[in-house]
Amino acid sequence: MAETESRPTNFIRQIIDKDLQSGLHKQIHTRFPPEPNGYLHIGHAKSICLNFGIAQDYQGQCNLRFDDTNPDKEDIDYVNAIKNDVIWLGFEWHGEARYSSNYFDQLHAYAVELIEKGLAYVDFSNQEQVREMRGTLTTPGTNSPYRDTSIEENIAQFAKMRNGEYKEGECLLRAKIDMSSPFMCMRDPALYRVKFAHHHQTGDKWCIYPMYDFTHCISDAIEGITHSLCTLEFQDNRRLYDWVLENVTIDVVPRQYEFSRLNLEYTVLSKRKLIQLVDEEFVSGWDDPRMPTIAGLRRRGFTAASIREFCKRIGVTKMDNMVEMSMLEAPLRDELNENAPRAMAVLEPVKIVIENYPQDGVELLAAPNHPNRPELGSREVPFAREIYIEAEDFREEANKKFKRLVLGKEVRLRNAYVIKAQRVEKDEQGNVTTIFCEYDGDTLGKDPADGRKVKGVIHWVSAAHAVAAEIRLYDSLFTVPNPAAEDDFVACINPESLTVKQGWVEPSLAKVDIDEANIQAFQFERTGYFCFDKDSTTSKLVFNRTVGLRDTWAKIGD
């Protein structure tokens, strides 16, 4: 798969083009500002590709800034995981990674400035009272009894907040805007709250922490961000973004623009819901291959290039829509079809005994690593008297549409000989345990000499040489296309989202170096694309199914 090389066009890039042409900006400066309270997911990948992609295409800069204003939910492990994901996706941020906490002193000074201008006040109303005073979407709010406290008293009270003289929840600093505004975010929003929590960057220096809407815009301005790109749920908050910057003394005034967030079928992208899946052990962790996290997708075998290509294909708009899972898989399937070396693996084996093959005979047959790329070379596959094939590749009786092994008929073994099934052996339950065959020793790499047609081809492994492997077959985590819309999304979890098979793989796979940072993918012929899992060891191979050979989502939708 070749990544799309042409520069994408969208409404944000059109705005940037106009800003550059008009001379409003000489250099474009964007940022990616995740909160370090969880792992990044595929929705974040869209934002990463947008912000870093714009900086690359316009020879600008993109900052990585951690929005770390909520210390009791954040962790340095999340910080490190986020950095790793951005790098893995192929991007490099400008300068050092930044933190909103870098600006806590400046943010505090700006809060004092708002108080001195009569634009902020300390409110001692409790949480329920604040909620009631806000009003509703159809009724205006009411002023707090603390709204008209003098500037001098507010300065003194805010200093006491800073000094730890008030308890958590006892008071908060609010902006003084308009309690009758039709926009809820403008009804005297909170700017600071008391929180006695250890911070992963600032330690115990602070016991008051700024709110996101106050921090976000000022951090953008301090860093010289020209275009602050957010998802549509922050559209109304742009009014507060602009209000803060208009009322503090700051040189750079960035502009916020909103685009639609990613909604992907058969998964959830809400961080709260993802945390619930992890905490309640519906999945094995943040990097469970069923998770839509970048770590989970990477472990499943998705490549950075395929994710970047997916983000290019879905584009950037202002219209929310649900993206089909097939859109995510298509670039990956294209890439793996082009690049993944081939191998043979049998997931549900049944034994074949080739009765006319020498008892102790072994041949090393040449098998191409890729049918269309001879430069990838070939490998040796051992062939012997006893082999395994997939149980589903054999029937005692079948119609003409079945092109695999049938009793009394022939089939070709991939990269090997033509065999014919003669008889079977069954267990007490009537299940076929062994198929006895004969092979045509003159058909290696060529058709039968007498011109008879053998249409079917099946894969196999040598019973004596194959390596045991645990093979994990992943499916969608949910049974409905939009689980987030359900009252109880966990009730929609797919009980068959993971099936574990104990199969056999050709011995060449045991010689591959297992590198978690650079996961090796393979096409298991006729089965799908697979990769090593991090649980794999030299004594126990573990493979994850990354994606099937063909798109199966269309069938689910029918």
Swiss-Prot record:
Motif ('HIGH' region): 34-44
Coarse class of the protein's main subcellular location: cytoplasm
UniProt-listed NCBIfam families: glnS, PRK14703.1
Sorted UniProt keywords: Aminoacyl-tRNA synthetase, ATP-binding, Cytoplasm, Ligase, Nucleotide-binding, Protein biosynthesis
CDD domains on file: GlnRS_core
Cited HAMAP family: Gln_tRNA_synth
Example GO molecular function: ATP binding
Reaction(s) catalysed (UniProt annotation): tRNA(Gln) + L-glutamine + ATP = L-glutaminyl-tRNA(Gln) + AMP + diphosphate
Top-rank taxon: Bacteria
SUPFAM superfamilies in UniProt: Nucleotidylyl transferase, Ribosomal protein L25-like
Matches recorded under InterPro entries: aa-tRNA-synth_I_CS, Gln-tRNA-synth, Gln/Glu-tRNA_Ligase, Gln_tRNA_ligase_bac, Glu/Gln-tRNA-synth, Glu/Gln-tRNA-synth_Ib_cat-dom, Glu/Gln-tRNA-synth_Ib_codon-bd, Rbsml_bL25/Gln-tRNA_synth_N
Origin species: Pseudoalteromonas atlantica (strain T6c / ATCC BAA-1087)
Protein name listed in UniProt: Glutamine--tRNA ligase
Family that this chain belongs to: Belongs to the class-I aminoacyl-tRNA synthetase family.
Oligomer and partners: Monomer.
Compartments (UniProt record): Cytoplasm
Binding site for L-glutamine: D67, Y212
